[in-house]
Amino acid sequence: MALTPLLLLLLSHCTGSLSRPVLTQPPSLSASPGATARLPCTLSSDLSVGGKNMFWYQQKLGSSPRLFLYHYSDSDKQLGPGVPSRVSGSKETSSNTAFLLISGLQPEDEADYYCQVYESSAN
């Protein structure tokens, strides 16, 4: 049986307080069912991914975006409602990139994925 590649579209969204970070994602990513997708979101050099709140959203055709993953650190991650445990996140400070990881890809994972960074404006 032939495996059909899944197409995962990546779109970026940015927010911030005083500085406006730029988030960069590739326009699309293809992966085979059962594989692990590693979706990157690279921050501009004026901010460090290490100490930032990263949010990931999933949007399927005809639906509103839904919170998929909140990720601050390895010990502070939270899946959105109904998101399977095969979803996780990681950060790579050397490349200033956050990653959304989806293991055991399934056809229902085909969607648009948005990353967002939140920087608290607390003084």
Curated annotation (Swiss-Prot):
The keyword ATP-binding does not apply. Its main location: secreted. This is Probable non-functional immunoglobulin lambda variable 11-55. SMART domains: IG, IGv. It is found in: Secreted; Cell membrane. Residues 1-19 form the signal peptide. Residues 20-44 are annotated as: Framework-1. It comes from Homo sapiens. Probable non-functional open reading frame (ORF) of V region of the variable domain of immunoglobulin light chains. Non-functional ORF generally cannot participate in the synthesis of a productive immunoglobulin chain due to altered V-(D)-J or switch recombination and/or splicing site (at mRNA level) and/or conserved amino acid change (protein level). Immunoglobulins, also known as antibodies, are membrane-bound or secreted glycoproteins produced by B lymphocytes. It holds the Pfam family V-set. Gene3D superfamilies: Immunoglobulins.
